[in-house]
């Protein structure tokens, strides 16, 4: 009892600080929740109101949404931009990909998916070295997207008629312990059909 009487002031200050921290934390979570709802509404509004006539406005709104660096709606905005072929400017799209990859806080596998999509988006116009550079974070990891990335490289070399390199990548897929089953099947088919001796 004496302890409480003697330290009454310190206990009140300590309790007040703890209460203030709890209220601050809960307030921050509520603000984040409201911001997420706002971004969701903004994205849905862009999708619903999209018309070819207001294409430039849609592009600007989607770019703004990508730059919000939200783990959910920023990638969705970029995918909407690409899927609807709203811009032919590959450089602009690559800048947005880099914004997501380098500046947005993402789950590691979501980040790897975005890297893979960037490589896929660019695969018909870039060099072997550039494609490998984009995909190297995935290829040099245990990502679930590793087999997809190896398959993209194999198909890239196959399309360039660099059959030995293509064969090497198809073989790497087959040897992967956690490779996607469909990709293993396709790789085996390709090896049996086009590379059997």
Please report, for each region that a protein language model flagged, where it lies by residue.
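Extracytoplasmic/periplasmic/luminal assembly and interaction segments
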Residues: 55-105
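N-terminal positive-inside, membrane-proximal cytosolic segments immediately preceding the first
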Residues: 1-20
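Short extracytoplasmic/periplasmic juxtamembrane "stem" segments immediately C-terminal to an N-terminal membrane anchor
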Residues: 39-57
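TPR-repeat structural position
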Residues: 36, 55-56, 90-91, 128, ...
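Soluble extracytoplasmic domains of inner/organellar membrane proteins
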Residues: 78, 85, 96-197
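Transmembrane signal-anchor/signal-peptide helices with a preference for the extracytoplasmic
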Residues: 21-41
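Short coil/turn and helix-start
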Residues: 33, 52, 87-91, 106, ...
């Amino acid at each position: 009892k004496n302890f409480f009487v003697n330290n009454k002031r310190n206990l009140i200050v300590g309790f007040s600080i703890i209460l203030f921290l709890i209220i601050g934390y809960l307030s921050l979570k509520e603000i984040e929740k409201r911001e997420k709802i706002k971004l969701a509404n903004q994205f849905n509004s862009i999708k619903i109101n999209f018309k070819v006539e207001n294409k430039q406005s849609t592009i600007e709104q989607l770019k703004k949404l990508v730059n919000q660096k939200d783990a959910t709606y920023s990638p969705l905005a970029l995918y909407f931009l690409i899927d609807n072929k709203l811009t032919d400017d590959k450089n602009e799209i690559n800048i947005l990909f880099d914004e997501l990859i380098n500046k947005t806080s993402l789950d590691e596998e979501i980040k790897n998916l975005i890297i893979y999509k960037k490589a896929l988006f660019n695969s018909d116009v870039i060099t072997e070295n550039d494609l490998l550079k984009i995909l190297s974070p995935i290829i040099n990891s245990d990502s679930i997207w590793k087999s997809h990335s190896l398959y993209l490289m194999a198909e890239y070399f196959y399309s360039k008629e660099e059959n030995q390199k293509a064969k090497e990548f198809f073989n790497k897929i087959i040897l992967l312990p956690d490779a996607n089953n469909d990709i293993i099947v396709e790789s085996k088919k390709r090896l049996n059909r086009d590379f059997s001796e």
